[in-house]
A protein has these predicted regions:
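N-terminal/domain-start alpha-helical segments
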Residues: 1-114
Length: 114
């Protein structure tokens, strides 16, 4: 049986690696990127089933990345952000995200949304 492929796009290495460790322990195949440009490169070459994308990143932020990938791909996207204002959540959802998780979050909260 093929594993479910999750892309984690997060510029904070500690958070990125923590999500990877937890999702792998739950049986997911995890691909990682440090910014939106790397994330798009992985999307174009791998079969991704779900992306977990930070909003604020260098080079290409999460909103820009999701807007670009939505031109060709429709798999679910969970946005991560330290911004917890309702307007930020609405912006993320309007730009193509399926869910929005504010930092800090627990592994169980993220898994429930995956």
């Amino acid at each position: 049986m093929e594993k479910y492929h999750v892309l984690v796009v997060e510029d904070d290495k500690e958070i990125r690696d923590g999500i990877e460790i937890y999702l792998k322990s739950q049986g997911y195949e995890v691909f990682k990127a440090a910014d939106g440009i790397e994330g798009l490169e992985i999307i174009y070459r791998e079969e991704i089933h779900l992306a977990i994308v930070d909003v604020m990143m260098p080079r290409k932020d999460g909103i820009q990345m999701v807007m670009e990938m939505r031109k060709d791909y429709d798999f679910p996207v969970i946005m991560l952000s330290a911004k917890s204002e309702e307007v930020d959540k609405i912006l993320g959802l309007n730009m193509g995200a399926d869910d929005y998780v504010t930092k800090p979050f627990t592994p169980l909260e993220l898994l429930a949304r995956v």
